[in-house]
């Protein structure tokens, strides 16, 4: 197979992924608004379409990334993405908003950057738990609840 990297097709896949991802979010917001306004059937159709768009985006994502990685790989990728967002992207966006006099937007960018930093820390902690085998283990007694049946267990391991 030809090399995808640097090709127009790669750029098109990235645009398709971005477009489908944005459409999914937009339709989810539209569904929420329709539901609040009492248009349940319309909300359901927006949600159904949002789920379709999610699946379309997944096709393009898998082609761009040769599938979906392991949980360990995905946690690292997520942490790195969050790091970029809070250290570079939102920092630059906030500076530019300040320069242009959009103080309220600059503050929002700065606030979201702080949240992205927390996201990075959370992903890195989860990654460490996976690497050390501590996902289902705690140092002190913890309440564990089965996500399937709801059974409650108290102990240091799930």
Where do the language-model regions lie?
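Non-heme di-metal
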Residues: 1-158
